[in-house]
């Protein structure tokens, strides 16, 4: 009998810190700025990345200190995964919370951190600007995209 991987046997609250961190697929989509319509609460995606995102690796340049540098950085926890409605449908945290399995390209499944990029899921090659390039809020409108433009 083969043991099932941890993401198939545990819920998010049961994960160790190491398991939690490994669940991130490294796509970088959570590091893109989203706009929210004040009237409808609809979420709009942009191709503007957080200043800390490395657009090639799709990893944070200063992960341990990100909240100090970027105070409004979302610190995902098991408690808020269900509340964050802009998480991509491909997000492993969302998938596990919903009781779904990970996709073939997830590094925990494929064994390679490159498959998330090869599958076109990551933001590699899709970042058009960084938040420090934006002069005012209206500048973000020039970089609005549909989520399918981010993940193939």
From Swiss-Prot:
Chain segments annotated as coiled-coil in the UniProt record: none
Superkingdom as given in the UniProt entry: Bacteria
InterPro entries: Puta_zinc/iron-chelating_dom, UCP006173
Database matches in Pfam families: CxxCxxCC (PF03692)
Similarity field: Belongs to the UPF0260 family.
Record's protein name: UPF0260 protein BAB1_1496
């Amino acid at each position: 009998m083969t043991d099932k991987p941890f993401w198939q046997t545990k819920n998010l609250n049961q994960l160790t810190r190491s398991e939690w961190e490994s669940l991130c697929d490294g796509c970088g989509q959570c590091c893109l700025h989203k706009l929210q319509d004040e009237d409808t609460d609809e979420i709009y995606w942009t191709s503007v990345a957080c200043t800390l995102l490395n657009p090639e690796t799709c990893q944070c340049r200063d992960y341990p200190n990100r909240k100090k540098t970027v105070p409004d950085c979302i610190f995902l926890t098991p408690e808020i995964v269900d509340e964050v409605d802009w998480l991509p449908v491909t997000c492993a945290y969302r998938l596990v919370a919903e009781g779904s399995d990970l996709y073939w390209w997830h590094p925990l499944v494929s064994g390679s951190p490159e498959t998330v990029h090869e599958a076109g899921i990551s933001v590699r090659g899709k970042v058009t600007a960084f938040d420090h390039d934006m002069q005012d809020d209206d500048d973000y409108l020039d970089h609005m995209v549909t989520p399918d433009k981010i993940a193939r």
